[in-house]
């Protein structure tokens, strides 16, 4: 499978096109809309979330609620577009440190940085959550589930303290990042491959996780902690039971060994940096005058860690769904499930 997204933060709509879905997959729009709603929630979100009411509109690829094998096109309307339509907006010339502003303006020869930030904005992730929700619907047919939890915000792991530290950051004109854990359950042994570098499952997942705006680090299982331990305290010993088959009593590998899923839950942690739009802006340079200025301020969140967790679920669900289709094949959901069940029987009897 593959997908692309299109649209700007304050454009008329966001669009996503998914190619390669099997036919007869039930597209539950209520589920997709609930996932979009999740993305809009969480502590520290900005005023934009009070404007938008993200809902998916299927444009093609579905008949009677099910996919038909052709590309699935979906649209999410930007309600805030009405507030910008026809409005003359002054050029933005003061890049924000930590954003794509300066690099993007230089790369694409843009004297108005808004032409960069409109696409680099995390608003684009609404389209990816919709895409990932479709992937989740496919995975549900195979009893594979993706979930997440926020481990830290602003270095604090106690959830009850998050509202307080977020308000403190807001009062100081600052922003906060955090750490998110993604758990993928029900993944069989055998997704990914050791035979080529670009087929390794952990590499594919890391690539997609790192593609999410503001994500600056990723680890699997023990991650960096594995570098501090001897091998005897890192590697997961192998056991066998006639009913369970091969299994492990620990999961330090995070469900992947040699680039291949090993049957344990896949455990990923991602580090999200603080949002680079600060109410009290950092120093910058005006790209026209070349004079020292304060960076521009755009309406933004204090933190979006909880929202990012939903986005990370989506991109990870996409990878696992894509790998399932690569391995098991099937032009219809019925064929995919038949092939998948046969493979599970093979693994059980190995």
Swiss-Prot record:
FMN binds at residues 119-121, 213-214, 258, 273-277, 299. Pathway: Metabolic intermediate biosynthesis; chorismate biosynthesis; chorismate from D-erythrose 4-phosphate and phosphoenolpyruvate: step 7/7. Keywords: Amino-acid biosynthesis, Aromatic amino acid biosynthesis, FAD, Flavoprotein, FMN, Lyase, NADP. Its EC number is 4.2.3.5. This reaction introduces a second double bond into the aromatic ring system. NADP(+) binds at residues 39, 45. Homotetramer. This is Chorismate synthase. Its cofactor is FMNH2. One of its GO terms (cellular component) is cytosol. GO terms for molecular function: chorismate synthase activity; FMN binding. It is an enzyme of class 4 (lyase). It catalyses: 5-O-(1-carboxyvinyl)-3-phosphoshikimate = chorismate + phosphate. Reduced FMN (FMNH(2)). It comes from Thermoanaerobacter sp. (strain X514). CDD domains: Chorismate_synthase. One of its GO terms (biological process) is aromatic amino acid family biosynthetic process. Belongs to the chorismate synthase family.
């Amino acid at each position: 499978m593959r997908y692309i997204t299109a649209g700007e933060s304050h454009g008329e709509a966001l669009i996503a096109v998914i190619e390669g879905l099997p036919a007869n997959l039930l597209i539950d729009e209520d589920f997709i809309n609930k996932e979009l709603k999740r993305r809009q929630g969480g502590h520290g979100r900005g005023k934009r979330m009070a404007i938008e009411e993200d809902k998916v509109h299927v444009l093609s690829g579905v008949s009677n609620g099910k996919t038909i094998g052709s590309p699935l096109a979906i649209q999410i309307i930007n309600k805030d577009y009405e507030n910008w339509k026809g409005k003359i907006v002054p050029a933005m010339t003061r890049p924000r440190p930590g954003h794509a502003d300066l690099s993007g303006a230089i790369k694409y020869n843009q004297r108005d940085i808004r032409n960069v930030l409109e696409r680099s904005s995390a608003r684009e992730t609404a389209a990816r959550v919709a895409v990932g929700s479709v992937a989740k619907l496919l995975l549900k047919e195979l009893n594979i589930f993706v979930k997440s939890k926020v481990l830290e915000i602003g270095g604090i792991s106690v959830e009850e303290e998050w509202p307080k530290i977020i308000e403190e950051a807001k009062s100081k004109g600052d922003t906060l990042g955090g750490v998110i854990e993604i758990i993928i359950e029900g993944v069989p042994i055998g997704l990914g491959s050791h035979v080529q570098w670009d087929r390794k499952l952990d590499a594919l997942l890391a690539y997609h996780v790192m593609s999410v705006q503001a994500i600056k680090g990723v680890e699997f299982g023990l991650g960096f902690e594995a570098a501090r331990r001897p091998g005897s305290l890192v590697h997961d010993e192998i056991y066998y039971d006639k009913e369970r088959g091969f299994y492990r009593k620990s999961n330090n590998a995070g469900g992947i060994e040699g680039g291949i899923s090993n049957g344990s839950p896949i455990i990923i942690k991602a580090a999200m940096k603080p949002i680079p739009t600060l109410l009290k802006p950092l120093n910058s340079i005006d790209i026209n005058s070349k004079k020292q200025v304060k960076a521009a301020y755009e309406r933004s969140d204090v933190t979006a860690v909880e929202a990012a967790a939903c986005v990370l679920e989506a991109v990870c669900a996409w990878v696992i769904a894509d790998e399932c289709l690569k391995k098991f094949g099937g032009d219809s959901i019925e064929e995919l499930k038949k092939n998948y069940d046969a493979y599970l029987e093979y693994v059980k009897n190995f």
